[in-house]
Amino acid sequence: MGKTHLLNSIGLELKKNHKVMFISAERFMYQFVKSIKANDMVKFKEYFRNTDILLIDDIQFMNGKEAMQEEFFHTFNALIDKGSKIIVTADRAPNKLSRIQERIKSRFSGGLVVDVQKPDYELRKNIVEKKIEELNNLYPDQIKISKDTKDFISNEITASIRELVGAINRIVSYSRIYNKMPNQAETKVVLKDLLNLNENKVTIDLIQTLVCKFFKIS
């Protein structure tokens, strides 16, 4: 499960018994700038500090935005002081966040840091099955996807949940538009850019292979 999906799931579960606010860092910045222009920062502060749990997605978006970081830092402290919780996601570990104030990174590192790994095969397979089932219910008798195609997608689209869902949507659209079950060759054409993206991903094994080849060592 990707970080955004996970954050959404956490929010939905906590919302049953708590006041929860879910927002992206980009949206937080938009609201911040809007409040400055309207000369109404009091309302902004009240809005974001009146919650039990604040969830912010893609916190790395704050990189280099000093004024925004300053306000976030004070919001963070205000919430913690009153016993609220804060959960943020980023595309890297706290100590790897560039152009983020050290005091903010220190706050992040002082909490529970969880590394969300890429989905394994079984999870990808379950997501493919579940997503196609949902789309079948939405478009009854319009989708024809073979087990081989499902297995191919589960095996080949490994980078992220977002790419996996995107691949499923493409194949389903192809099946509906052409009213046919796409074979593997057609599936490869439809997903060409995603497959290339995964094939070209630089890995430690690839680096080792290239270095050994360059220096002619084994």
Task: Report the location of each language-model feature.
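Walker A/P-loop
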Residues: 1-21
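Loop/turn-to-beta-strand initiation segments
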Residues: 18-19, 50-53, 79-88, 160
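C-terminal helical "lid" of AAA+/P-loop NTPase domains
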Residues: 129-133, 148-155, 162-177, 186-189, ...
